[in-house]
């Protein structure tokens, strides 16, 4: 009786392990899962940050700062959604680093927004340079994924 129970338990365990292996996320599957999330964020940023460069040039720093803060909130939401997507185990280290850069981008957008609202244009410009550098580092992590919308390009808006 104990042998039969042990065999059934082992068989069930092997079946579960096989299902887990079959359900392992692939790089292609990951890209398919995250691109719509990034697309939504990109489209939101196009609306939110569309005229921000002109606002800053015209000295309208408070509205530009408000736009940066909205973009920060959108990116933080996107970052949380991206973190919830199962990752391919072979790419977990790269994706973990990429997600940390994405999270940092949200913080930098927020810092730049606060600086603009406070009338600190030079400080905001310095933060935007840091933001662009951070985005480049993030993109380097996932170059092999051939992302379209998940390639972060803050320079399009700033």
Residues covered by each model-derived region:
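Bacterial N-terminal signal peptides that target proteins for export
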Residues: 1-8
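Bacterial N-terminal signal peptides
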Residues: 9-17
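C-terminal region of N-terminal signal peptides and the immediate post-cleavage residues
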Residues: 17-30
């Amino acid at each position: 009786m104990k042998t039969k129970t042990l065999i059934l338990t082992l068989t069930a365990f092997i079946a579960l392990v096989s299902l887990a292996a079959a359900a392992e996320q692939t790089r292609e599957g990951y890209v398919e899962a995250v691109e719509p999330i990034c697309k939504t964020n990109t489209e939101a940023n196009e609306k939110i940050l569309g005229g921000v460069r002109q606002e800053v040039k015209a000295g309208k720093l408070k509205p530009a700062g408000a736009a940066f803060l909205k973009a920060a909130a959108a990116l933080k939401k996107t970052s949380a959604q991206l973190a919830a997507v199962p990752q391919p185990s072979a790419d977990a280290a790269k994706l973990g680093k990429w997600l940390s850069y994405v999270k940092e981008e949200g913080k930098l957008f927020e810092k730049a927004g606060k600086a603009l609202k406070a009338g600190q244009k030079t400080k905001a410009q310095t933060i935007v340079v840091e933001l662009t550098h951070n985005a480049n580092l993030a993109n380097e992590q996932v170059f092999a994924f051939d992302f379209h919308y998940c390639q972060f390009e803050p320079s399009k808006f700033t």
